[in-house]
Amino acid sequence: MKKVIKKIALAYSGGLDTSIMIPWLKEHYEHAEVIAVICDLGQQEDLDAIKNKALKSGASKAYVVDVKNEFAIQYLWPLVKSGALYEDQYILGTISRPLIAQKLVEIALTEEVNAVAHGATGKGNDQVRFEYSIKALAPQLEIIAPWRTWDIKSRQEAIVYAKAHGIEVPVTPKAPYSRDHNIWYISHEGGVLEDPSQEMPDDVLLMTAPVSQTPDEEEVVVLDFKKGVPVALNGQELSPVDLLNSLNQKAGQHGIGVADIVENRLVGMKIRGIYEAPAAAVLYKAHKLLESLCLTRSTLHLKQSLQQTYANLVYEGRWFSQTKQALDAFIDVTQQHVTGCVKLKLFKGNIIPAGMHSPYSLHHPELATFEEDNVYNQKDAEGFINLFSLSAKIYSQVHQGGNYD
């Protein structure tokens, strides 16, 4: 017997798609009650207006959940500690999806709903990220993905459906780009950006100044870290949200943190995206510099070898996985002594190191100096070299003439 769905929690953004999903869900699930869940991730939108729109569209309730601080502490700071970049470029702003799914599930369980729904399309990665997280957190909940089942195939059809159901559709030109925004980044896709042979127009950028319009004087910023986590900017301890907002403003005006990428989507296609993440770029640079000072060679190299694995699991939405828990445990150990201060200069899109120090620095000038010293006996190197190169020497002797094929 088919399960009767009487109440549905919907991850709601306020856009056209999720707005028409409210009446569509009520029609296709025997007038089920729909509860809208809106997450405040720092996207700088009028969330009260979005809540009212959800209610006007037919939702019985609409929750607005401020998750900015939780987003920074439980998601972004672990990402900074990991140093992970998807395909060595993408700053992973869609790390927000598991958090949205988590809040959707929490409210779903509180409201005792039968099912949850999301507005991700059948072509993108987000459907995987949302549904993986939901299944990991609450496998008993049914998941509804209208884009994979309904008959609406275009924006024009969606507008017609909205008007037929009394949903207000603003009379404005269609945005030239599809955007996603949170406190960590802004992404831009679609329009002219779909052609990788075309240069990115300056009008794409919202958070970052084009390099041609940046100040002609550098700006110095100083970041303090404690166990791999940023805790202060320019000597002032700030909340995670305030630190990100301030650093986004400072780095953004210097044209820092723009990535023009053709990425491999999880679902198989390649897509071009423009990503703005000024604060993220600076934090990653500062953290990487501090790690170079505080981690041993073998620890640093092992951590670097795992960064793509971590990036992949974040990109794929596998936040609530055993693999991620295991990697976090390793990373947390590596970060125990990543504490210190990093000075950087921001100038014309560049992040320039300007000094760093740490009470746990493994750099000792008396060992590294090129001047005369009484600490390092250079004769000791001979025995090490003999042992280190022994296998190469034996191979050459056996195969005569050093033929390495």
Swiss-Prot record:
Binding site for L-citrulline: Y90, N125, R129, S178, S187, E263, Y275
Catalysed reaction equations from the record: L-citrulline + L-aspartate + ATP = 2-(N(omega)-L-arginino)succinate + AMP + diphosphate + H(+)
Subcellular location: Cytoplasm
Principal cellular location given in the protein's record: cytoplasm
Any one annotated GO CC term: cytoplasm
GO biological process: argininosuccinate metabolic process; L-arginine biosynthetic process; urea cycle
EC numbers for this chain: 6.3.4.5
Keywords: Amino-acid biosynthesis, Arginine biosynthesis, ATP-binding, Cytoplasm, Ligase, Nucleotide-binding
Enzyme class: ligase
Keyword match Amino-acid biosynthesis: yes
Binding locations of ATP: A11, Y12, S13, G14, G15, L16, D17, T18, S19, G119
Leader peptide range in chain numbering: none
Residue numbers binding L-aspartate: T121, N125, D126
InterPro entries reported in the protein's UniProt record: Arginosuc_syn_C (IPR048268), Arginosuc_syn_N (IPR048267), Arginosuc_synth (IPR001518), Arginosuc_synth_CS (IPR018223), Arginosuc_synth_type_1_subfam (IPR023434), AS_cat/multimer_dom_body (IPR024074), Rossmann-like_a/b/a_fold (IPR014729)
Pfam families: Arginosuc_syn_C, Arginosuc_synth
GO MF term set: argininosuccinate synthase activity; ATP binding
Stretches assigned to coiled coil: none
UniProt pathway annotation: Amino-acid biosynthesis; L-arginine biosynthesis; L-arginine from L-ornithine and carbamoyl phosphate: step 2/3
NCBIfam families: argG, PRK00509.1
Protein family per UniProt: Belongs to the argininosuccinate synthase family. Type 1 subfamily.
Description of how the protein assembles with itself and partners: Homotetramer.
Protein name: Argininosuccinate synthase
Organism lineage: Bacteria, Pseudomonadati, Pseudomonadota, Gammaproteobacteria, Legionellales
Encoding gene per record: argG
